[in-house]
């Protein structure tokens, strides 16, 4: 509000640090050369630029097609960007695990929601790869050797954190000791869902001792006492609001994860049909079998019980 009798026009708070009473003088045509385009900084010889901050040079220099085929660049970038999204998903899941252990659930909700959005990005990425035809893929496939997404150690850690444990999946990484050790630690640690079940016990729900002291290297299996606890939560959500919200965040997460897996299968079938995968898996049949994996079984079964 202007003081009484003050006829000066109000200044925009974002107008910069010019003197308030200075008259506006149009800039000369050549002023942009000296002051920067629309006052933007143009000289980064002494300061950090966008490319410096993001380390773009090594990232954009990390694509090395092995074939003369035009479409290999798409194949490489598709998988590299997926690995970057998985890096973010793992970063958020580790933070969510720590928050759940500390009974700090609101931050965990935000992190889990973000992971679900990351998975949506990964689902959409298959649409780009699906522009590659079977003929185009066949031209570059011999250059892939035995490399396969099956060997992605970030994907394997993601599966382990979400509870789909399988010690045999360590073997493809035996030639890289540091990665093997990292994955083995993830295999032996409680999964995200294991920590949520511990949370249920801390909130007073009677969870079977053998479930709370389970062999963490084994995949998640349905437990009656866990389903009974979730049933109580869903029947009185207002009395257990944080647990109710946690349950729904987990369902959102698994829903998105299933969609990612399904889109993977359909893209593979579209491009290579039912040929053997480059990593010697059965290809599409192997991926279809993975669609049957249920990460949080009680949360799905309780919907029938309600």
From Swiss-Prot:
The enzyme's E.C. designation: 1.13.11.11
Cofactor(s) listed in the protein's UniProt record: heme
BP term (GO), one: L-tryptophan catabolic process to kynurenine
Coiled coil: none
Region listing for Disordered, in residue ranges: 1-29
Keyword Transit peptide annotated: no
Signal sequence segment: none
Binding locations of heme: 264
Superkingdom of origin: Bacteria
Co-factor binding details: Binds 1 heme group per subunit.
InterPro entries linked: Trp/Indoleamine_2_3_dOase-like, Trp_2-3-dOase_bac, Trp_2_3_dOase
Group of enzyme by EC: oxidoreductase
Residues involved in substrate binding: 75-79, 137, 141, 278
Gene Ontology MF term list: heme binding; metal ion binding; tryptophan 2,3-dioxygenase activity
Pathway info: Amino-acid degradation; L-tryptophan degradation via kynurenine pathway; L-kynurenine from L-tryptophan: step 1/2
Record's catalysed reaction(s): L-tryptophan + O2 = N-formyl-L-kynurenine
Cytoplasm keyword on record: no
Keywords, ordered alphabetically: Dioxygenase, Heme, Iron, Metal-binding, Oxidoreductase, Tryptophan catabolism
Function text: Heme-dependent dioxygenase that catalyzes the oxidative cleavage of the L-tryptophan (L-Trp) pyrrole ring and converts L-tryptophan to N-formyl-L-kynurenine. Catalyzes the oxidative cleavage of the indole moiety.
Summary of subunit composition and partner proteins: Homotetramer.
Family according to the record: Belongs to the tryptophan 2,3-dioxygenase family.
Cited PANTHER family: TRYPTOPHAN 2,3-DIOXYGENASE (PTHR10138:SF0)
Protein name: Tryptophan 2,3-dioxygenase
Gene source species: Burkholderia mallei (strain ATCC 23344)
Lineage: Bacteria, Pseudomonadati, Pseudomonadota, Betaproteobacteria, Burkholderiales
UniProt gene name: kynA
């Amino acid at each position: 509000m202007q003081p009484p009798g003050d006829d000066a026009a109000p200044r925009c708070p974002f107008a910069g640090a010019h003197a308030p009473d200075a008259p506006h003088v149009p800039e000369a045509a050549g002023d942009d050369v000296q002051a920067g385009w629309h006052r933007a900084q143009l000289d980064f010889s002494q300061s950090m630029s966008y490319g410096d901050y993001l380390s773009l040079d090594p990232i954009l220099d990390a694509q090395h097609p092995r074939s003369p085929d035009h479409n290999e660049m798409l194949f490489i970038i598709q998988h590299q960007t997926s690995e970057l999204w998985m890096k973010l998903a793992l970063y958020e899941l580790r933070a969510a695990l720590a928050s759940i252990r500390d009974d700090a659930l609101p931050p965990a909700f935000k992190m889990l929601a973000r992971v679900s959005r990351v998975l949506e990005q990964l689902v959409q990425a298959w649409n780009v790869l699906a522009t590659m035809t079977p003929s185009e893929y066949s031209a570059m496939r011999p250059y892939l050797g035995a490399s396969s997404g099956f060997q992605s150690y970030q994907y394997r850690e993601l599966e382990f954190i979400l509870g789909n444990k399988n010690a045999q999946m360590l073997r493809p990484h035996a030639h890289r000791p540091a990665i093997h050790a990292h994955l083995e630690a993830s295999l032996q640690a409680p999964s995200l869902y294991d920590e949520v079940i511990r949370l249920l016990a801390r909130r007073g729900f009677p969870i079977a001792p053998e479930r709370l002291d389970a062999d963490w290297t084994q995949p998640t299996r349905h437990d009656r006492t866990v389903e009974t606890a979730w049933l109580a939560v869903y029947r009185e959500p207002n009395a257990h609001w944080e647990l109710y919200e946690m349950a729904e965040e987990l369902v959102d997460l698994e829903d998105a994860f299933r969609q990612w897996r399904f889109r993977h299968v359909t893209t593979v079938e579209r491009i290579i049909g039912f040929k053997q995968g480059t990593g010697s898996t059965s290809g599409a049949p192997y991926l279809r079998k993975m669609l049957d994996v249920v990460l949080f079984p009680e949360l799905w079964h309780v919907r029938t019980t309600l």
